[in-house]
Structure formats: structure tokens, C-alpha cells
Amino acid sequence: GFAHFFEHMMFQGSKNVADEEHFKIIGEAGGTNNAYTSFDKTVYHQTAPSNLAETMLWLEADRMGTLLEGFTQKKFENQRDAVKNEKRQRYDNQPYGMVNEILFKTLYANHPYEWTPIGFVDDLDIATYEDLRNFFLRWYGPNNATVVVSGDVNPEDVKIWVEKYFGGIQKCPDVRNVYPKKPQLSMDLYVTTTDNIYAPLTMFAFPTVQEFHPDEAALDILAEIIGGGNNSI
């Protein structure tokens, strides 16, 4: 859950940007910004008028390069509580909220996907300020990031701005691509759990192909036909 934790921390100010000012700068220009964490990545995204493109790159570079200069124990404690509350509100106390956690534990045993991106409260409780600081230094660097800029901008200008603002940021340790062995099911698995919910829920999960496989589109359509809406099978 540390990657998701940092999704929160990245909006709490850096050396040259005050707490919540990232939102303010973009919002006052009529833009929007947010972030999300999945199994494989954390994405920070913003949409704003094209004349703000350089400012957006500067904002991203400032928090990548100087976040720890605005990182305090108080902010750490506040955001730890925020993440725990988010987990309770969106998962623990929601009808069927724990279904995906149970599913991934079952389907991806002994694989990184066994752990959902939101993390676990027990891990958050024992996490320390130093743990989060070390996590940032290990993973947040220009050599482990992809910058995507699209819209009414001059590509040559963008290259200059990226080099200007990101070029001086210290690299994080080299990141090795790891491809864990895909879990294989030798038999059908059935899991039943009881919750304080009146209506039962049945979920079927079928291991298929990896992302971008030629069969992915057809399987997405099949999933929609089987269980994608009121007219599904």
C-alpha cells in the first residue's frame, strides 16, 4: 500500500509548492488533476489549458525532485489516517467491498497481484516515517517514470521543458523489469464468504491472456456479454 500512500503524499507540498497548492494552481486555470494507483503503476494526471503546459511539468518535477523537503511527521500521520479511512469507506464498510480482495488472494496466490493497491491497515499501522521516505527514494526518480504530454503543444518546447525541469533530478536506483510467473489453476476454485449483506453475490473469474494479447479485445466483448449490464447473460 505504500505506492497508494504516496499518491496522497504527493499533493501535500514540496520545496516550492505549498500544501494543496498543486490543486489550486491548476484549478484556478480551469484545469483538473488527480491520481490513481493500480497493481503496476501510479499515475498523476492533469488536464488544463495548453498555455499551462510548462507550469504542469514544473509542478510534477518539483514534487518528484523535492517532495521530501516538504515531508513531515505530521503530514505522514494525517495521510496515514486518510488512507485508513478511505479503505474503510470504500472497501471494509461497503456492501461487497471485500470481494476483490478475496478474489485476488485466491486467483493470484504467491504473485504480486495477491495484494490490492489500497494496502492493508495492519501494514499502515506499523509503517514509519522512515519507511515511506526510503520507499520514495527507491522508486520515485526520472529513470522510473514516463512523462506523457498531449494536446495543443509544440513537441520541441515540451522536450526543452522536460529537460529543464526533470534533467537535474537525481535518479533512483536502477529498476529491473520483473515478470513473475503467471499463476496456473489446475482445478476450479470455489470460495464462499459471509458478510452482513441481505442480497447474495456470485462472481466468476476466468484466467485468460495478458494485456495487449491479440485475443484481449474479443475477451473484453465476451465479458460484457456474459456479465456487463442489464442485458447480459
Which residues are covered by each model-predicted region?
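Zinc-dependent metallopeptidase catalytic helix centered on the HExxH motif
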Residues: G1, D215-A217
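Active-site SXXK
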Residues: F2-S14
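Buried hydrophobic packing residues in well-ordered domains
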Residues: H4-F6, Y44, E60, V83, ...
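M16/insulysin-pitrilysin zinc metalloprotease superfamily fold
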Residues: G13, T47-Q79, G228-N230
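Non-catalytic beta-strand/loop surface segments
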Residues: N16-L52, Q89-N144, G168-H213, G227-I233
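Short beta-strands and strand-coil junctions in structured, solvent-facing domains, enriched
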Residues: A53, T66, G70, P155-E156, ...
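Non-catalytic accessory/assembly modules
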Residues: F71-D81, R88, Q94-F104, I126, ...
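Non-catalytic, conformational "gating/processing" segments within enzyme and secreted inhibitor domains
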Residues: Q73, R80, Y129-Y165
